[in-house]
Amino acid sequence: MGPTASGKTALALELAEKHNCEIISVDSALIYRGMDIGSAKPSAEELARGPHRLIDIRDPAESYSAADFRADALREIEQIISMGKTPVLVGGTMMYFKALLEGLSPLPSADEAIRAEIQAEADANGWEALHEQLREIDPVSAERIHPNDPQRLSRAIEVYRISGKSLTELTQTKSAPLPYDVVQFAIAPRERKVLHELIGQRFRIMLEQGFIDEVAQLKARGDLHLDLPSMRCVGYRQCWQYLDGEFDYDTMVEKAVAATRQLAKRQLTWLRSWPELNWLESGAEGNLVTLMRQCR
């Protein structure tokens, strides 16, 4: 694991080439087809060196939850082990790692009719009124969820209306944790400044590779919009807004790089409190040797 632009893919490919391993992607952007440049999806050459599972498995119009990931990852892990190989999970979506390692609460699936009903109430009365509803049925979640966070607020109310139980009550029960021995590594530069520079460099390379054209093609489909999880991925939202004329090119670059740096900051916050984690420095010589030594 590690923040964006920290060198996870390069190390994973080295591991896959030199040892009997297969890579499973743990990345909420790489699951989407047609989102290659802005997600820093491994190139065709890199995928030939080390195939990645759970890449290009969803259309950008579709949703994909942590529960979906857990089910898919468990299936892939079992298959890789049955082949006599070692699965290597690589990515920066910490919620996916957490769901896989610790299990998930038995929450009901989304109900589009109830979601539409909640949205209609919000349009008529405002999200503050719905937040008061949540405070009555689930005061713990109401303290945690801000009235200006409609996605999480809607989900908490939806869960109650489907199940008759609060989100707090349901999240107190989890499925079984991962039934395998796991060695966990994080890779990142020692200095935040270095990571910030890497993020800026990588985004400029994405632009040179045709990222704006990629977003324009997605936009031209007509069925995608900025409220979809796929279009909330860093870089895509800012480029979409640029194409809509909301700001100029330089502002788009500034906003996209800033959003990516904020993502990296959140990822590092998760990792600093992550238990049983072995740290590696980005670009350091001997990372593979250190990793293999820890796995023995």
Curated annotation (Swiss-Prot):
Region described as Interaction with substrate tRNA: 27-30, 151-155, 232-237
The UniProt catalytic activity note for this protein reads: adenosine(37) in tRNA + dimethylallyl diphosphate = N(6)-dimethylallyladenosine(37) in tRNA + diphosphate
**Source organism (scientific name):** Shewanella sp. (strain ANA-3)
State the needed cofactors, names only: Mg(2+)
Q: Does the keyword Lipid biosynthesis apply?
A: no
The molecule here is called tRNA dimethylallyltransferase
Protein family (similarity comment): Belongs to the IPP transferase family.
Describe its function. Answer: Catalyzes the transfer of a dimethylallyl group onto the adenine at position 37 in tRNAs that read codons beginning with uridine, leading to the formation of N6-(dimethylallyl)adenosine (i(6)A).
Could you tell me which InterPro entries the record lists for this protein?
Dimethylallyltransferase, IPT, P-loop_NTPase
Q: Which GO terms describe its biological process?
A: tRNA modification
Gene3D superfamilies the record matches: 1.10.20.140, P-loop containing nucleotide triphosphate hydrolases (3.40.50.300)
- The annotated site for Interaction with substrate tRNA falls at T93, R115
Q: Which GO terms describe its molecular function?
A: ATP binding; tRNA dimethylallyltransferase activity
User: Which residues of the sequence carry a binding annotation for ATP?
Assistant: G2, P3, T4, A5, S6, G7, K8, T9
Provide this UniProt record's keywords sorted from A to Z.
ATP-binding, Magnesium, Nucleotide-binding, Transferase, tRNA processing
**Lineage of the organism:** Bacteria, Pseudomonadati, Pseudomonadota, Gammaproteobacteria, Alteromonadales
Q: Summarize where substrate binds, as residue positions.
A: T4, A5, S6, G7, K8, T9
Q: Which SUPFAM superfamilies match?
A: P-loop containing nucleoside triphosphate hydrolases
Q: How does it assemble?
A: Monomer.
Q: Under which main EC class is this enzyme filed?
A: transferase
Q: Could you tell me the EC number(s) of this protein?
A: 2.5.1.75
